[in-house]
Amino acid sequence: MSRRNPPGSRNGGGPTNASPFIKRDRMRRNFLRMRMGQNGSNSSSPGVPNGDNSRGSLVKKDDPEYAEEREKMLLQIGVEADAGRSNVKVKDEDPNEYNEFPLRAIPKEDLENMRTHLLKFQSKKKINPVTDFHLPVRLHRKDTRNLQFQLTRAEIVQRQKEISEYKKKAEQERSTPNSGGMNKSGTVSLNNTVKDGSQTPTVDSVTKDNTANGVNSSIPTVTGSSVPPASPTTVSAVESNGLSNGSTSAANGLDGNASTANLANGRPLVTKLEDAGPAEDPTKVGMVKYDGKEVTNEPEFEEGTMDPLADVAPDGGGRAKRGNLRRKTRQLKVLDENAKKLRFEEFYPWVMEDFDGYNTWVGSYEAGNSDSYVLLSVEDDGSFTMIPADKVYKFTARNKYATLTIDEAEKRMDKKSGEVPRWLMKHLDNIGTTTTRYDRTRRKLKAVADQQAMDEDDRDDNSEVELDYDEEFADDEEAPIIDGNEQENKESEQRIKKEMLQANAMGLRDEEAPSENEEDELFGEKKIDEDGERIKKALQKTELAALYSSDENEINPYLSESDIENKENESPVKKEEDSDTLSKSKRSSPKKQQKKATNAHVHKEPTLRVKSIKNCVIILKGDKKILKSFPEGEWNPQTTKAVDSSNNASNTVPSPIKQEEGLNSTVAEREETPAPTITEKDIIEAIGDGKVNIKEFGKFIRRKYPGAENKKLMFAIVKKLCRKVGNDHMELKKE
């Protein structure tokens, strides 16, 4: 692109697949050329040379065709003027060919003194600072922190006007009393000296007289008269007219007269700050003059005086031992000077703002995009010159509203932290008006899912469990209520507990007698429920059974897993008819009574199912109505008993028979009868033709043939007859 092609190297043929947007321009130019040729070669337009036959008659000034012809003329003149620098010429257009525009790079000499910056406005609409901004527009670098608090150009101009008006007003107020107190002779003589241009001593004498008069007039001001002091305006006026010597002499005369006046009256002269006059150089006020000499605060000792170092002991010529110290080295990194310079230049961003400050754009330097942007400049000969962009800036608009500073935002947040949001108060008001205290308190209770209606009647009630509330522990911090008789203390404690239970807790409970179950909920821990028992039994099956097993509730070792699971999921089947005495002692909770009352309306069909079968004993589970038809305890329909039911009713005493007692009796019968010995036939029948799970097979054999001897025989027979299939199964060996 930077190479300049000679005229001979261009054959004039453009590419055939060029973009069609050039076609419209080519057709327009051909039309203009044809029209100019029809007008004739004799007439010529003003300002157009007659050498070309294509240029003809006069065209109207406001006609766009005339502007096109004028442009062609300028291009032709530019090509002739630039013939020494460039050999490129615009080729005569052919209707069958496309136009070619040469592209060249800018010379290195021109690029040295040129810096090109691109400004991009990040906005959806087109931004034109000349039309969209309020002129004049200012582009400068400045600190953008707290930009909303910085003054705009309009505010600065307004304040400058106010300050200038204030200064003029103050000068007028100062000059008004001074004009009346000035001596006429002094002013006339001063004006004469200035107009006549007399020598410096003459002006000096005049200023001395004026200053002397001013001092004499200032003395009564100390004593309390109303005559104002002389103003130093005369001295400044002399200085403004070029009489500098007069000002210095006037100052000297003022000092001498003031000193004589002070000595004469014996009182110090008080000078106001406004009357002190301007300093020699206001920029150097408060600075200390340095003469280059070193100032020492310590007193100098002459010869014959006491030496301050006389009390210091001599060192004896000893020196401190210095080892071979290694020279400390540090690593230095050479910084790029261009990067350092760029960081210094871009420390403050560019800010473009208009006069009123309504349009403020802040530019950020984009280092990565500077290499991909160029400018194409149109030259006089129709070619383009490519100029690389040095820097690219992206301008973003600043907010037109004032934002909060960090301190103001923290104060706002501190104020809001103690307040409650408005919507929350409204929500609380709706709750208070639409619901009652009973509903609001009941929301805190957690509902527990009910189990099936079939298992509801068989659920054990823990109300018979009584906790010892009178037991005292060593870590109890509660002191006894009354020191005295223990029996009276116990009665008072029980009375207080009853009152607490009978108290109506915010209208949530009905007026009814407290139950023992509620006492457990308030003052003690409830007995482990069915879920807890199920979890405990599941833990006992694991390897940590010794930690969770108890002496009271031991699992029967002769029960199978199916029996244990059935026992966990179901309540005991065999219950007594005559359980009135037990039901009186057991008082169910009101919640359970309510559930039973609701379940009573639900019609349930009587069901009967087999719970377990072991050792020719079948345990049935069913409804109470069906179980009443069977005799109590163990029953064998094949055995005939010559005992009437009436005799059984008179002889037997009703006593509660539980499932655990029946299990214990069966266990005792098993212990009395000797265990059968296992044989190979039993193993073959148990395994069968297919695969068997090893664990289930072992449990089945140990349950059917208990004993250590049968266990050893089982291992020997299994090793002899079976083979392992996988990790968990086995089968009989095929012969």
From Swiss-Prot:
Residue(s) carrying Phosphoserine: 198, 515, 560, 562, 571, 655
Example GO BP: transcription initiation at RNA polymerase II promoter
The keyword Magnesium is assigned to this record: no
Residue positions, PTM Phosphothreonine: 200
Keywords assigned: DNA-binding, Nucleus, Phosphoprotein, Transcription, Transcription regulation
Matching InterPro entries: TFIIF-alpha, TFIIF_interaction
Other facts noted in the record for this chain: Present with 1920 molecules/cell in log phase SD medium.
Name of the protein: Transcription initiation factor IIF subunit alpha
